[in-house]
Amino acid sequence: MFYEIMHRESCVAQLSTTGECRVCLEDFMPYDLVLVESDDFDERINNVTNFYYWCASRMLTLDRTYAKEILNSIGASQSVTDRERAQIALSYHCLSLLDVFWVKEENEKIRFEDINLFAHSLSNALVDIALRGHQMTVTNAHLLANDLSTGGLYPKAWVRKEDGFYLYKDGGREAVEREVLASKICRCFDCHQVLYEQGMFENEPVSISKIMTSQRYSLVTYAAYDVYCTNHDWNTLDKILELDAPGYYMMNILDYLVGNTDRHWENWGLLVDNETNQPIRLHDLMDFNRAFQQYDTPEGANCLTVGKRHLSQKDAAVEAVRNIGLNQVRQVEHTVFSEHPAWKATFEERLRVLRDAM
């Protein structure tokens, strides 16, 4: 059997279950999927392994809170291999709200415009399962996709409203409070960023943000881009600085100022133009529910975005302001720290450090 890996309505590659492969549109391949046209047995095995791993990555992660309940709700096993998880993802064509890739079987009569999640509703039941861990039947399980698995350990789900999709993130009152407060601070700086507001779901606080992807723009994680760069013998950070140095430096500045210690390689990356499958800049800065951690000193934690270098968050932020300045557009209102006076003192100290470094 052959699978066709699709980018919107175009077939970018065909792959058999034995690893025979034909790449049709190399420039439109997923960044983190490596397929090789070869008669070599080992390379064909690698093709199959890479394909199933890629499909599985578009499935929910098993260490996610409530993940077992979500699996149960679509009738899946509680302990599944990459291949089994891939089969679950393939059952709904590996659809996602993060990009426009999908998979179909050869000669299967189906179009992206008929099934894509940007134009077709998600069941409200999926929201309930993802956020609250309820056990219920999902009648349109084929619409469950990577949008319930946006990375990280916190329960989250997309909710469709009249003006588009919104991400609801749970994780407890403290995590929500940290994310919303960090967002209020970051808005005082010139940077592409996701705006987080506080809301409620079943009488529990959630942070709410609007989707940044669409049928025109996709998100590619740093992890995926690193795979792509490695296979081209490029230095990933060099390519990112070449593409969007201001966005990269502002990320390091803001993560330092708000004490965000969780900037791992799945929650930053590229915004890609789906017309060309080429990156245009770093995607909007997101994920602040681990902000205000290791926030009792000016140094901060180790910076996770500087490759093999060993820098503190302070050192990375100082380096950043010396390259692009602070880019503060308005003062941070003191009232945002009304419930956390200690955080206010640390923020002001860190802001002073950066101003003095300019």
Set out the residue ranges of the language-model regions.
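Conserved protein-kinase catalytic-loop segment immediately C-terminal to the catalytic Asp
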Residues: 264, 269-272
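Phosphate/dinucleotide-binding and metal-coordinating scaffold of catalytic cores
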Residues: 1-253, 257-258, 271-358
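Glycine-rich phosphate-binding P-loop
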Residues: 261
